[in-house]
Design a protein with these regions (language model features):
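A short, Lys/Arg-rich alpha-helix, primarily the initiator
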Residues: 1-44
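DNA major-groove recognition helix of helix-turn-helix/homeodomain DNA-binding modules
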Residues: 74-91
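Short C-terminal boundary/hinge segments that cap the last helix of small helical domains
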Residues: 86-103
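Amphipathic alpha-helical segments of tetratricopeptide repeats
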Residues: 121-128, 160-168, 197-205, 234-245, ...
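Residue register of alpha-helical TPR repeats
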Residues: 138, 177, 211, 218, ...
Length: 392
């Protein structure tokens, strides 16, 4: 199913009927929303309030009262202000339907319907006139979601400035989504404390969004708070089953497997991951399969079952094996533990020659090389460098 953007317009009535409806909408719309929209347009265009006041032949305080919602803005005033800002206001976009579109995109994100989600986002981006309408803040919330979820290197600072001006007009569900995406942004920056603050704000507005609980369990897993992680995994699984979100359910169960692994329940971790591996093959989910196999290689290492470790490693697609330095590390350790030092050093050399390798892995692999060469002092220096890298 693809969301039909034609439904965001207020209808196809004859022009006189449309004008009447536009007038009614304009009269009934929240003055604060209009004020925030006009202010955010002015801020985005970097236009001083003095210039707006001069063009409208009113005082700056009058413009300020319009922007704060103390005074209502007529359609004529809206048009004049937008004209000064170099845009024209679109009165046809139905904000309620755009709110539904925000929820629809977020649902697709929750369900891992990535292609469908991105297709809808692209349609929104192609209709940039929405950015100067009653649904302006929904438009920028969608752009912000796109920037963070897809990590597309887009500068989201402008989106955030606009959304901070307009968030007071959001529904509770929109606010919950907004703060959840802010939390996700901080998660990508490894700022778990700030991410948790935003997640707490998100759940104040809606405590039943699947991704809110999923993000909680991911953070607590990373922090080592396993009791809390288990609490949110269970809640996430409960919501996923209720919403029939089977794609996301697989990744939730993957988190459960990581929790078993982190609490040294290796048999449970292996059994769950093997069941998920079977499911990933049925669904032809290559990325899920790669995540599961990575876990199984690590489980095999920790259980000292090196034969299984090599078996699972051979099942990993080569494209992932070259880019995932955790897997590269597992492969080196497998050869190291079976005393195949020649191959271990070969893979270390290959990794160190890769320009994309990070400082942590570079130091760690050099440490392993020095250990193989029985150069313990240099190995210790490299390990200390690893810790320094983590601290910085």
């Amino acid at each position: 199913m693809v969301y039909d953007l034609r439904c965001i317009y207020i209808g196809n009535e004859p022009s006189f009927a449309l004008e009447t409806k536009v007038r009614d909408v304009s009269n009934n719309i929240n003055r604060s929303l209009i004020g925030n929209i006009l202010k955010s347009i002015r801020v985005e265009k970097n236009i001083p309030m003095k210039k707006i006041a001069s063009a409208l032949k009113v005082s700056e305080s009058t413009v300020s009262q319009i922007e704060t919602g103390k005074n209502s803005a007529t359609k004529e005033k809206i048009n004049e202000i937008c004209h000064v800002c170099g845009c024209s206001f679109d009165y046809k976009t139905d904000r309620k339907k755009m709110i539904d579109l925000v929820l629809y995109i977020y649902t697709q994100y929750s369900n891992l319907s990535t292609d469908e989600m991105n297709s809808t986002i692209e349609e929104v981006k192609n209709n940039s006139f929405i950015s100067c309408s009653y649904a302006r803040f929904e438009y920028y919330l969608i752009l912000y979601m796109d920037g963070i979820i897809n990590q597309n290197n887009e500068d989201v600072q402008l989106f955030k400035r606009i959304l901070e001006i307009g968030k007071s007009s959001f529904s509770n569900k929109e606010l919950s989504i907004y703060y959840d995406i802010k939390a996700l942004e901080k998660m990508y920056l490894n700022d778990s404390i700030k991410a948790l603050e935003y997640l707490n704000q998100s759940r104040l507005y809606d405590n039943e969004f699947l991704m809110n609980h999923y993000h909680y369990c991911s953070i607590y897993l990373n922090l080592g708070y396993y009791t809390l992680a288990q609490k949110y995994i269970r809640k996430s699984i409960e919501i996923a089953i209720k919403e029939v979100s089977f794609e996301r359910l697989c990744y939730l169960l993957l988190n459960q497997g990581v929790l078993y692994l982190s609490t040294e329940q290796y048999v449970e971790a292996e059994n769950l991951n093997l069941k998920l591996l079977k499911e990933s093959k049925i669904r032809n989910e290559e990325f899920l399969k790669y995540c599961i196999l990575s876990n199984l290689v690590l489980i095999s290492l920790l259980q000292k079952n090196y034969e299984n470790g090599f078996k699972y490693l051979e099942m990993v697609d080569q494209k992932y094996l070259e880019d995932d330095y955790d897997l590269v590390l597992y492969r080196i350790l497998l050869h190291l533990f079976v005393k195949d030092y020649t191959l271990a050093k070969k893979y270390i050399r290959q990794s160190l020659s890769n320009n994309s390798i990070g400082k942590y892995y570079k130091n760690f692999f050099q440490c392993l090389k020095y250990l193989i060469d029985n150069k313990r002092e240099k190995a210790i220096e490299r390990i200390e460098s690893c810790y320094n890298t983590l601290e910085n």
